[in-house]
Amino acid sequence: MKRTAFFISDGTGITAETLGQSLLAQFESIPFNKFTRPYIDSPDKARVMVQQINAAAERDGVRPIIFDTIVNQDIREILATSNGFMIDIFSSFLSPLEQELIAHSSYSVGKSHSIGGNSNYMERIEAVNFALDNDDGARTHYYDKADLILVGVSRCGKTPTCLYMAMQFGIRAANYPLTEDDMERLQLPAVLKKHHSKLFGLTIDPDRLTAIRHERKPNSRYSSFAQCEFEVREVESLFRRENIPNINSTHFSVEEISAKILVEKGVERRFK
């Protein structure tokens, strides 16, 4: 039976959605209709939200799951009148923390994601700009400033991984696509040799690579299975010869790939 889940917040909804998604992912056999509702920051908005929750309960024949990070007690009480199963994230965790720390929390809306006074904000922006400026081997003269350089065949997941690490952790990651010419030379390009300690390889199953490339250039040599199989085989051989740590990206999310790379390379996150 499909269930409905709401991620409700009086701020951006990032915390409610992130934690809620992680919890729901543990129930792989149950399909969910998921809805994020940010900035529910007034009694009127809360009452409209109650109507949506109740409508979903009537439609589904079972009460929705509600993940909320509402700070205002009055708004929380209004939501509690709905026909939903409430998981109040702040109340669940803040009360035990207050007891352990012998201190009262500030109960501030959007505290962890605010820009003002947040030294991480500029780090994040600079890291994202670095990833974009050094994407796809377009520029290589700033590699000395990189924390990591991802290498692999075209369309194996290098760019989204670099951007995720930049956004989430402030990591300055460049990426370089290994071409057929590089494979025929049987060695790393000179620009990569100088930064061998920063290299991490991404590989991918040939059939998956074929499907991805077919969306970009259908019925071309570039997207043919034979070409994809050749490139993957040669790049994996290059990784072994050059002793470059690597991971197959086929069955991992960008979050999992990023975490594995940081652990393998011992790179510290600029912020957590």
UniProtKB/Swiss-Prot annotation:
Signal peptide: none annotated. Disulfide bonds: none annotated. Keywords: Kinase, Nucleotide-binding, Serine/threonine-protein kinase, Transferase. Its EC number is 2.7.11.33, 2.7.4.28. The keyword Cytoplasm does not apply. It catalyses: [pyruvate, water dikinase] + ADP = [pyruvate, water dikinase]-phosphate + AMP + H(+); [pyruvate, water dikinase]-phosphate + phosphate + H(+) = [pyruvate, water dikinase] + diphosphate. GO terms for molecular function: ADP binding; ATP binding; phosphotransferase activity, phosphate group as acceptor; protein serine/threonine kinase activity. ADP binds at G152, V153, S154, R155, C156, G157, K158, T159. The keyword Metal-binding does not apply. It comes from the Bacteria. Belongs to the pyruvate, phosphate/water dikinase regulatory protein family. PSRP subfamily. Bifunctional serine/threonine kinase and phosphorylase involved in the regulation of the phosphoenolpyruvate synthase (PEPS) by catalyzing its phosphorylation/dephosphorylation. This is Putative phosphoenolpyruvate synthase regulatory protein. The lineage of its organism: Bacteria, Pseudomonadati, Pseudomonadota, Gammaproteobacteria, Pseudomonadales.
